[in-house]
């Protein structure tokens, strides 16, 4: 390996530590404390401490190291990961009916992420700020205001991008993980017998001894692996090897040392259960640790916010969410984006959650159900990919799925039991997003089908216009067309009302391919349909943002010269009229109309100069 490659690998691995592992890396702030919360009724006794530590350790090994890093990360789409990517991969080589089922599962998984993303910033920052009650108990009433203040600052700076401060994320998180390791090692040295919990017999005996209560306690143990989906979702940014290298060399050892250090502290002083993480530190280090923990949780929150921006862009490009304004905050990095409506909706939800739950321990009950639900769906989708795409042996795939679900389903079931103590929150938020995504996709499809079902043949119309041409005016007209072989509504209405046609007519279709990026060479396909009509198909990946200026540039290189300021863009604007429906479809129609009215208009979506756009209205019944 060359020196340059080693330096590059080190830099990317460090960057992965700063972004990918923020959520799972801040879990030691609250996980072990929640295991002994009053919900489960466990006393701080050696066998219970050993049982929880053993469960946490083997959860990190089996779920993170084996399931995600070894298996799930094999399933990539041109290097990209994430639940929607896995959904699209799983649906490639199966029947349309089975594809529909997998799409529903994928959308449920994506919706779970929206539910989780509201909780992560709240519980992370609150658990860090709660260190104040250890350092200065009199400041306890200010935990909620301080948490809101920190997160307000974080959401405000989103519109400016995080490129400059983002350079500090990796060093800060590296210091954080080293601090976790040192604090834990210091405690383990004082009480080394805690290392016996590495033996899985303690986890097994914990279940045997405490039976049903131990099953309920899985709802707390799962807090140790929240954020595991980020490893897969951020695969496209950093690559598989750097993410794996960061986990096995830095993150996993640091987490294990810290959890076992907290366990050693509890064996020595059971009273430390009120906040075992901060009580690991000597008195002089409490304030620096509080500051470092706050920075780490802010970075973890930033990673989650960036993740929801990326997921939203992917959902928009794949047609599951209405078009919305997406602002690129970096000229160098296409992945750095800002979506105002998502940012401020998320901020409002996070603030309401902090005010409503007040303490991170109250919020912990709400955490986990979305994570484990996504884990179950990931297992099903991954095994479908292994069977249908990679042609693994069917019996091997069934065996693998059973092994994965033996781990996933008990954790999910344990968290479902927390439904009425907070689990309703991510489920409710996820349900809202699922309804929005399925409504937009299905109603949009029905609308386009209704608009095109009575449309005449495009080729026949062009032949008729060439044979008996209307009045021609100088210039180029571009008609946005959603389907390649359908006459654009705007063209029909222009001929109907204005009875003129431009010298050159371009029918432009934007197509989103099932890949993250499309190579520039394949960006534009041009077909001359007649002496005065051209069809242009512009292909983009779901990580890209369509841009008409770029399309015109590519057209010029292919021989079709179009000048932006000499071209008129004709677009149709549909006024939707709701027909008589059953009550549940009526409500869905109302939601679709509301989403359509607030969707980003095509000129803004494709960055077309407003003074070059002509919109022609039409009424459509839905």
UniProtKB/Swiss-Prot annotation:
It is a multi-pass membrane protein. Its main location: membrane. GO terms for molecular function: potassium ion transmembrane transporter activity; symporter activity. It catalyses: K(+)(in) + H(+)(in) = K(+)(out) + H(+)(out). It holds the Pfam family K_trans_C. The chain crosses the membrane at residues 9-29, 46-66, 101-121, 137-157, 165-185, 213-233, 247-267, 276-296, 337-357, 363-383, 395-415, 416-436. One of its GO terms (cellular component) is plasma membrane. Keywords: Cell inner membrane, Cell membrane, Ion transport, Membrane, Potassium, Potassium transport, Symport, Transmembrane, Transmembrane helix, Transport. It is found in: Cell inner membrane. The keyword Cell membrane applies. PANTHER family: LOW AFFINITY POTASSIUM TRANSPORT SYSTEM PROTEIN KUP, OSMOTIC STRESS POTASSIUM TRANSPORTER. Belongs to the HAK/KUP transporter (TC 2.A.72) family. Responsible for the low-affinity transport of potassium into the cell. Likely operates as a K(+):H(+) symporter. HAMAP family: Kup (MF_01522). This is Low affinity potassium transport system protein Kup. It comes from Yersinia pestis (strain Pestoides F).
């Amino acid at each position: 390996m060359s020196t340059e490659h080693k330096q590059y690998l080190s830099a990317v691995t460090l960057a992965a530590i700063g972004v990918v592992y923020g959520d799972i890396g801040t879990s030691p702030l609250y996980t072990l404390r929640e295991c002994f919360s009053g919900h489960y009724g466990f006393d701080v006794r050696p066998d219970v401490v050993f049982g929880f530590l053993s469960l946490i350790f083997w959860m990190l090994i089996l779920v993170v190291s084996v399931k995600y890093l070894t298996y799930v990360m094999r399933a990539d789409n041109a290097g990209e990961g994430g639940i929607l990517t896995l959904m699209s991969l799983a649906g490639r080589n199966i029947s349309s009916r089975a594809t529909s089922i997998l799409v529903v599962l994928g959308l449920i998984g994506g919706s779970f992420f929206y539910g989780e993303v509201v909780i992560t910033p709240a519980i992370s920052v609150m658990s860090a700020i709660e260190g104040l009650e250890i350092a200065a108990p009199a400041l306890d009433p200010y935990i909620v205001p301080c948490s809101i203040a920190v997160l307000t600052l974080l959401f405000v700076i989103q519109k400016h991008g995080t490129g400059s401060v983002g350079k500090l994320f990796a060093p800060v998180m590296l210091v954080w993980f080293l601090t976790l390791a040192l604090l834990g090692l210091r405690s383990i040295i004082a009480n080394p017998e805690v290392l016996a919990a590495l033996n899985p017999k303690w986890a097994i005996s914990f279940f045997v001894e405490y039976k049903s209560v131990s099953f309920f306690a899985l709802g707390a143990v799962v807090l140790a692996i929240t954020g595991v989906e980020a490893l897969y979702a951020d695969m496209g940014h950093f690559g598989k090897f750097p993410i794996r290298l960061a986990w096995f060399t830095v993150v996993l050892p640091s987490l294990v040392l810290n959890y076992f250090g907290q366990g050693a502290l509890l064996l020595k002083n059971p009273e430390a259960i009120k906040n075992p993480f901060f009580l690991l530190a000597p008195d002089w280090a409490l304030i620096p640790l509080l500051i470092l923990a706050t920075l780490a949780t802010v970075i973890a929150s930033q990673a989650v916010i960036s993740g929801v921006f990326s997921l939203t862009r992917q959902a928009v490009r794949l047609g599951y969410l209405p078009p919305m304004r997406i602002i690129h905050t970096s000229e160098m990095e296409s992945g750095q984006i800002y979506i105002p409506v998502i940012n401020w909706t998320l901020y409002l939800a996070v603030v309401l959650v902090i005010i409503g739950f007040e303490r991170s321990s109250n919020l912990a009950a709400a955490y986990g159900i979305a994570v484990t639900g996504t884990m179950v769906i990931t297992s099903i989708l991954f095994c479908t990919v292994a069977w249908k795409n990679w042609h693994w042996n069917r019996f091997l795939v069934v065996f693998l799925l059973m092994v994965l679900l033996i781990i996933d389903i008990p954790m999910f079931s344990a968290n479902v039991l927390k439904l009425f103590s907070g689990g309703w929150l991510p489920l409710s938020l996820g349900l809202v997003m699922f309804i929005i995504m399925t409504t937009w996709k299905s109603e949009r499809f029905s609308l386009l089908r209704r608009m095109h079902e009575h449309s005449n043949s495009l080729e026949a119309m062009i032949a008729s216009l060439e044979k008996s041409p209307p009045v021609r005016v100088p210039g180029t007209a571009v008609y946005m067309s959603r389907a390649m072989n359908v006459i654009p509504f705007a063209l029909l209405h222009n001929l109907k009302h204005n009875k003129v046609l431009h010298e050159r007519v371009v029918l432009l279709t934007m197509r989103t391919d099932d890949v993250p990026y499309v190579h520039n060479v394949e960006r534009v396909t041009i077909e001359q349909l007649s002496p005065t009509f051209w069809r242009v198909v512009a292909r983009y990946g779901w990580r890209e943002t369509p841009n008409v200026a770029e399309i015109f540039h590519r057209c010029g290189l292919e021989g079709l010269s179009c000048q932006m300021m000499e071209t008129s863009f004709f677009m149709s604007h549909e006024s939707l009229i709701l027909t008589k429906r059953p009550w549940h479809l009526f409500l869905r129609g109302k939601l679709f109309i509301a989403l359509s009215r607030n969707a980003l208009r095509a000129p803004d979506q494709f960055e077309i100069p407003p003074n070059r756009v002509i919109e022609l209205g039409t009424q459509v019944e839905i």
